[in-house]
Amino acid sequence: MSAIKLRAYQQRVIDQLASYLDNDSIHIVAPPGSGKTILGMTLVEKIQRKTLILVPSILLKKQWIEVIQHYYPQWEISEELLQPANITVTTYQYLYSKRKELDNHFTEHGIGFLVLDESHHLKKNWSDLLLDLKEKATELQTLALTATPPFDANQKEWGNYIRLTGAIDEEITVSELINEAVLAPYQDYVYLAPVTKESQKQFTEFLNEQNQIVSHLCSQPEVTDYLLAQEFIHQPLNQTEFIYQNFDSYLSCLLYLNEQQYQFSDDHWQVLGIKRNKIKIPQQTRKSIIDLYQYLFQVVPQLEIFRYLSKKGWLYEDKLRLFPDFEINNQANIPLMKEAIEHIVVKEESYLGNELRCVLLFDYIKQEVLAGKEDYLEYGVAPAFLSLKELIRPETSLAVVCGEFLIVSQKIFQTHFQTYAEFRREKKLAGYIYLAMTDKNRSELLALTTQLLDSSEINLLIGTVSLLDEGWNCPAVNTIIMGNAAGSYVQTQQIRGRGLRCSGDEKLTNIWHIASIYPNIPVTEQPLFAAILKRLSFIEGLNLMDEPVISTGRERFELPDILDLRTIAGYTQNNLYRAKERKQHFMLWETALKQGTHLAMPLFIRSRPKETEVHLESNAFKLDNVDQLNLIQAFLQGALNIYFKERKRKKHWHKACQVRQKLVQTLYQLLLNEGVLSESIPLVIDWNNHSFSCEIVASYHQEKLFNELICELLGEIHSPRYLLKIKQDYFVIPGRYSKNKKAVLIFLTAIKQQGLTADFFYTKNISGRKQLIKARLNSLQASDTLDINERKIWQ
């Protein structure tokens, strides 16, 4: 019998993992405060193999050893990697330092279970070493524990991470822990700070220059002449093998030539496998321009156009950089960012008074401003201190902490820091004392400062992200202001986690994100904010658009469609007002939590017009209201064209949803047949005039697998092994069911059992490539595009 008594949510995870205990890898996501160490030890006990536990810090190493000694005092523990015991605990850094001595270390010492604590750190070069060691120890089993999987890592980093940790098997959600009163509820707010007119001008000039370059690329006589001389253009039937193997390049050439008034010969239509009058050739897109010039740069880099691109910075060090990102001059916007922080602090101070326990975090210290350097365009810990100490009320206690120094008020110094007087340094900081931090006193000074914040003797603490990292904990924090740069999803979650510990009844933490906004630019095209919003969309929280719901997704931030100066100011002002309503938001969390028991992961499929489509609107009504428009109203308002167009769209959408429903049911039935799902796991499908949704209620691993298969089946068509055709529509046969023809036939049989008539095509031969081309062309000429999004909803 285990010596550890688990909480309900921990027991749920252990129960769900029972069927995975023999897998090569187990991967658990759990927020700070959920007891990842306890979960890890429970699994170590169940696995019963010689174990190596790797952690990213000495602090966590000590924590693991203390937990083991408390619950299992009889277990033999080693801290020496090269002299392992039944349980060995060490750091990733130490493992890496001994890499030359570890060639067959796991096999030679019989290590069978590897625990990777805080596994999100494995984006670093440690992962390459561990992957190599894991491949040599074929019997090795891994357990990855993390609060913050690197969801926004690039494709290569994420691939390496998953190769080592395996796919996520189970997740303990923040909402579960709030429901169990282990963590405190919170509310995320975005403060929109419009950039300066100078920055707006720079961005406008960037967009204008980009448009000029694109216009230049879309019509180049030398490019036209070169393409017309190629055999795959003037004799395509002789070059079908080249065309089918390089279809993206071929298609981009055709789209380009079409805009030069080139008339496609019958041979091209034969290669494309469609009749001339059955398709309207689409315009060039960003992707087609990239495909075209990447192809040309490979075969004729001497073209004059590439000298032009080099001058414009779109070709650098022999690499094309088409559509480069806007190089942001953050310095010009520093005064507005500082003003935003000051505004938030003053408001939160007025709302909470002495109950304020706020942490303001930056990336940089900028200590030189304490010595008198002009701070107007400096952004960091020290400049924020100098401005805020003049703004806050006399009774608000302010402190600053970073790796180099601590600043506290004279009153706090006299009552709590007299024993550290030897570290005092003379600085002209009226009313405040500067203490130098050293390796000798750092941990003590930080611990005492944290204690004073926890007890409200300090109300506002300014610090660096690097010092107040994932090991820092102060339960009393009720306001977090993220003054740092956008950072990664991992860093964002770690910072947010500083404010989620419970510290009494009805605590709710306000978490502020500051975003520089370019007025009149769509949200998705914002140079700075788009990346921040993407990270925030992964985070669950209260969605107050209608009734209170806990969900992920950008919708919960209720951002305005039009980001002009007026709406930017109104949005921010509304957030500042709502930040006052802590008690109301606490009750809304309670209401939302009562509506469910777990965080489900439904998929939502929506059709949206492509960006190039022109939206027709009349003064009488907009398309948003077309559901309420009947035939007589349409006639009276002169909108019959839109009425019939919308009616046709809805009819087509409902037919498509009926097919989707049967395809989803097919996948569900196949997973039942394989034993991946059980009959007790329900499938829920729903749709309306604008969206289609589906979900199963199962373990994280099962839900994720199901969603991935649906996305593969219904998503965008790239280069699948097998294609599925139902009437005129094409779908991808998921890789799980397209390893060979036998697997495909099983998939096809399951589809026919749902009452659908379907054909399949192997895309690696000529006839299959033709079908793939048709599928891609259908997608290109479609007026709408499908968005498939996974959201998490408490239900």
Language model segments and positions:
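Conserved segment of the helicase C-terminal RecA-like domain
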Residues: 498-529
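Conserved C-terminal RecA-like helicase domain
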Residues: 31-34, 38, 55, 62, ...
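Conserved helix/coil segment N-terminal to the catalytic DExD/H
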Residues: 81-110, 124, 128, 467
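Walker A/P-loop
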Residues: 22-43
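Long, largely alpha-helical accessory region at the distal end of helicase-like NTP-driven motors
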Residues: 216-267, 528-743, 750-760, 764
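A short beta-strand element within the Helicase C-terminal
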Residues: 462, 467-485, 509-513
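Conserved pre-motif I regulatory segment
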Residues: 1-29
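Post-DEXD/H (motif II) to motif III coupling segment of the RecA-like Helicase ATP-binding lobe
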Residues: 124-183
